[in-house]
Amino acid sequence: MLLCFRFGNQSMKRENFTLITDFVFQGFSSFHEQQITLFGVFLALYILTLAGNIIIVTIIRMDLHLHTPMYFFLSMLSTSETVYTLVILPRMLSSLVGMSQPISLAGCATQMFFFVTFGITNCFLLTAMGYDRYVAICNPLRYMVIMNKRLRIQLVLGACSIGLIVAITQVTSVFRLPFCARKVPHFFCDIRPVMKLSCIDTTVNEILTLIISVLVLVVPMGLVFISYVLIISTILKIASVEGRKKAFATCASHLTVVIVHYSCASIAYLKPKSENTREHDQLISVTYTVITPLLNPVVYTLRNKEVKDALCRAVGGKFS
């Protein structure tokens, strides 16, 4: 519970000595007529995302042909995406059918913590997968030696640790603020919408959020970009056309996921303040939080031959 006072002209419309104990999401308040349709669409996407990621994790675990570093990282990404989806979608769906209950400050902080943790973990897992593709293409003879079990675990733990550290930093900085309003203009407890409810100037918090966003998006993007520059330069040196096609094919799924993931995340968290409507900002958030997690199983199922073959073996009951 936080006690806040009138602060400057910007707070004139807010009550003095307001006691805030919970928040109410207002993300879809302007879509009354479309709420049932949106519920059906998001429910379908939710089920597909969970089913797709669970199938990928199960297939990788059961099929010995997929017990390689590349698919180890894919299973970790699918697991992270599954939890990420569970953090946001259930409450969002309940709000669309009028069953949304106020969320306590502790509940909001918890949701924000897991959202940030797994969102950033996903970014660095994609970076680790980029390094894995670099080693596979540029140093194939030593691939299994370099990408040994110890290094793979270290890369995954590193990604998770960065996510945890950033989440603790962000959540602590946001929930130290005094709040004077309880209506969150969003469909979950994201950092910026919650900060807007504060009675005091949040410039320092906004600068901190921007710096962290740059570090956890631009740095991984840069590393992936460097990896693919080296990968492409190596592939172009391959003499046979068939060899080049095969090398490109091993990277196509990862590159597709990387482009969409980082593009959506950058638009959502690195774009400057503008006169965009709330609906426009929410559309970007929906794309990043609902559509992107579905992309991983769809791309790797439709574009990756080894995963498709493993699914065929699973259906045919021919696991190794």
From Swiss-Prot:
GO MF annotation terms: G protein-coupled receptor activity; odorant binding; olfactory receptor activity
Chief location of this protein within or outside the cell: membrane
Annotated keywords: Cell membrane, Disulfide bond, G-protein coupled receptor, Glycoprotein, Membrane, Olfaction, Receptor, Sensory transduction, Transducer, Transmembrane, Transmembrane helix
Cytoplasmic face of the membrane: 58-65, 132-150, 228-247, 303-320
Gene3D superfamilies reported in the protein's UniProt record: Rhodopsin 7-helix transmembrane proteins
Keyword set includes Glycoprotein: yes
GO CC aspect terms: membrane; plasma membrane
PROSITE patterns with a match to the protein in the record: G_PROTEIN_RECEP_F1_1, G_PROTEIN_RECEP_F1_2
Pfam family, one: 7tm_4
InterPro entries: GPCR_Rhodpsn, GPCR_Rhodpsn_7TM, Olfact_rcpt
Extracellular side: 1-36, 87-110, 172-207, 269-281
Residues listed as glycosylation sites in the UniProt record: 9, 16
Subcellular compartments: Cell membrane
GO BP terms, alphabetized: detection of chemical stimulus involved in sensory perception of smell; G protein-coupled receptor signaling pathway; sensory perception of chemical stimulus; single fertilization
Disulfide bonds: 108-199
TM stretches of this protein: 37-57, 66-86, 111-131, 151-171, 208-227, 248-268, 282-302
Bilayer topology: Multi-pass membrane protein
The family this protein is said to belong to: Belongs to the G-protein coupled receptor 1 family.
Function: Odorant receptor.
Name this protein carries in UniProt: Olfactory receptor 10J1
Native source organism of the sequence: Homo sapiens (Human)
Gene name of the record: OR10J1
